[in-house]
Amino acid sequence: MKKLINQFIYIDENNPRVLMEPGIFIAVKLINLFIQTYISNAKITYSNDELIGKMGCSRSGLYDAFRVLEREGLIKRIYSDTKKRNRTEIEFNIDLAASWLKLTIYDKAYKNAPKRSLLRAVVSQTMIIIKDTKERILEAVGVRKSKDRKQRIEQIVKETERNYNRYVKHLKQRKIKQDKINATRKESILRHHLILGSIDWIKSLGMEPNPPDTLKIA
């Protein structure tokens, strides 16, 4: 599986920051984190607190993501006690995860998957693409020699490159759009807190503030 490292295309090189950003399902973030951890030959032994810190999520959100990943056969939580209080490791189905990360939004497997499926979420929100042109050639052409084999291979390579380039562009545009949404959300939250702070300060002076409509409660 080490060879997969050379096939990675990162949508954003700053992976720790991306893991913290909203707009990506927690289950998708976990898959991206686990596949990199697995390939680095490290066991997946993150504690819940470590994962919450990396994902910027709630404990309940993390548990929900675990259940989704287990239901899909992507992980299995290993415990050292029968009451399942001490988790020692998370077994990760690298083959299944890699097969999903090799897909693009133009592949039949993606188009035929249910709209609210985890597979679709992974393909449309991933931070890592595994580009495997060789596998696509073998699937389409096989190892049998034929007169038009070279021509068919060239055609598959050309189409694969085009689709991966389109896919990368799509994901990067999605990320830019999500970054703008996140920035607007942060600005709105900051403005909200500034207004509340101003109201408290005015009240401390014995005056009655007149908050904007956005802060009034009916």
From Swiss-Prot:
This chain belongs to which protein, by name? Uncharacterized 25.6 kDa protein
